[in-house]
Amino acid sequence: MFKVIKKQGRARRGQFQCAHGGMVQTPVFMNVGTQAAIKGGIDAFDLRDQLGCQIELSNTYHLHLRPGDETVKALGGLHKFMRWDGPILTDSGGFQVFSLASLRKIKEEGVTFASHLDGHRIFMGPEESMRIQSNLGSDIAMAFDECVENPAPYDYAKASCERTLRWLERCKAEHDRLNSLPDTVNPQQMLFGINQGAVFHDVRVKHMQQIAKIDCDGFAIGGLAVGEPTEVMYEIIDAVEPYMPADKPRYLMGVGTPSNIIEGVARGVDFFDCVMPARNARHGKLFTWQGTMNIKNAQYKLDDGPIDPQCDCPVCRKFSRAYLRHLFTAQEMLGMRLAVMHNLYFYNKLTERIRQALDADEFDAFRAEYSRKLAEKV
């Protein structure tokens, strides 16, 4: 299922087999299509044919509310619904539920919260999250967990991790049951557990040791990139990584910048996701191999060159900086679409180049050249 084929330091070059789309090459960036679509007018055919996407990520909470997971199941599952034949990971809905701080109530059974759409009350617990994700038919389901706010009191973070551990045990039991049903959409669906613990190293390590005993198909580090300093995030990864099973994929949830990805790989992480490339693109902020740029700046008004001379994406091959700036200035929808295409291609190409560097035993040199450079402004 998952195999590490090469290492350089803690950085891992691997392969991961999914029910859809064949072998995933890792490290990998997962393109975030929250509601079975990437904001900016990007469809499954763009992802597959033009942007180099290996895995798409969709959101359990949003799809449960609209169009409804039962609807998606009736239409053959998420792959058929969005016409994507590659792997899909669905998050558990936990992050969205717990971000509704003023609208939810936590109990041992699960969480009662108000829909952000119309305010009606919804209950979601481990079993409900597993059933929704089973209906969606994703390749990878994420366990239902509590993502505590930052900063969080030590005692609360500790108690929350104990509850999240119990929830993972319930997720595992329900997930196994659902996969055995004759009418399940994807009987090969996998389950990843999630490490929590806020910024407290001892809580994080103990929780990782506990969840590693449960037979999950992979493990994630959650609850980061929520306001803590970048160095604190790296320190937490350093603390937790030694206790993550070496034979299972490791996923750093919601992270991050290109530099974060390079540094995450250096610390033994295999999977990444983030809304940043698409979100930034919709505001004219683009990633290049020279650093970040704001295409709306006046300096690009007469610039006939590509966004990035070192990029071979469909946008850089065809359009100029001046044209893209004009589209944003004129508020044309095409501007957002082209910008999102470029940024997603860049992120997918970044992880491809990381894999190539690992294959060639040149990751340390790649990291030294690009980790700081990609964070600079052009």
Region locations from a protein language model:
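Conserved, mostly hydrophobic/aromatic
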Residues: 22, 56, 91, 133, ...
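Glycine- and acidic
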Residues: 150-153, 158, 218-224, 333-336
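Non-catalytic, usually N-terminal nucleic-acid engagement modules in DNA/RNA processing proteins
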Residues: 1-185, 298-301
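Structural signal for hydrophobic packing residues in well-ordered secondary-structure cores
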Residues: 137, 168, 172-175, 179, ...
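Glycine-rich phosphate/ribose-binding loops and adjacent secondary-structure elements
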Residues: 162-165, 174, 178, 186, ...
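C-terminal extensions of enzymes
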Residues: 1-15, 24-31, 40-41, 145-151, ...
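Short, well-ordered coil loops that connect the C-terminus of an alpha-helix to the N-terminus
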Residues: 53, 84, 138, 216-217, ...
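A non-catalytic, amphipathic alpha-helix used as a structural packing/dimerization or gating element
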Residues: 128, 132, 136, 159-170, ...
